[in-house]
């Protein structure tokens, strides 16, 4: 019989972070991050398919998006860093996973990737950067990265 314990089984969204570059540097002041994986389908319908469409799996692609507060802090990846990555057009390493446990104060937390837990990684190119500054609001920014190659789980091929 399955044992379910939501206090142990579920991953709190605050602990799932996006890290970029080979140094696994966290995106500073991130408020949201997501990984979207999509597979194309190839139409294989023929007269042998009767009245139903037939498909087989095609290429797989993915995007990573992240929203964060705009900051001048240089300890994490900032909007300025992301803009420079986009202009360079070079691929960057990315990692999405839980941060390591930290017993110090919130202000001194280095937000390092916990490689003992499940994480996803790969290479991607920054394809979109936007900066938003509303009245009586903290300025925020959004980025999108488009995958270059495979998504890996814990540094290994999936499947």
Predicted features and spans:
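Short, acidic/charged, Gly/Pro-enriched secondary-structure junctions
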Residues: 76-123
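Membrane-proximal interfacial segments on either side of biological membranes
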Residues: 154-158
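Solvent-exposed edge beta-strands and adjacent loop segments
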Residues: 2-73, 117-144
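Glycine- and charge-rich intrinsically disordered segments
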Residues: 1, 159
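Hydrophobic lipid-interacting interfaces of membrane-associated proteins
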Residues: 148-152
């Amino acid at each position: 019989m399955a044992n379910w314990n939501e206090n142990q089984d579920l991953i709190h969204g605050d602990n799932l972070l996006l890290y970029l570059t080979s140094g696994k540097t966290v995106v500073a002041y991130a408020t949201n991050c997501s990984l979207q994986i999509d597979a194309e389908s190839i139409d294989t319908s023929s007269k042998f398919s009767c009245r139903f469409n037939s498909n087989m799996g095609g290429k797989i692609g993915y995007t990573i998006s992240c929203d964060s507060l705009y900051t001048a802090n240089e300890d994490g990846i900032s909007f300025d860093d992301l803009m420079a990555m986009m202009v360079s057009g070079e691929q960057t390493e990315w990692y999405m996973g839980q941060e390591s446990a930290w017993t110090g104060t919130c202000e001194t937390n280095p937000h390092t990737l916990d490689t003992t837990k499940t994480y996803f990684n790969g290479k991607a190119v920054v394809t979109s950067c936007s900066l938003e500054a509303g009245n009586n609001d903290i300025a925020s920014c959004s980025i999108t990265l488009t995958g270059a190659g495979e998504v890996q789980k814990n540094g290994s091929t999936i499947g």
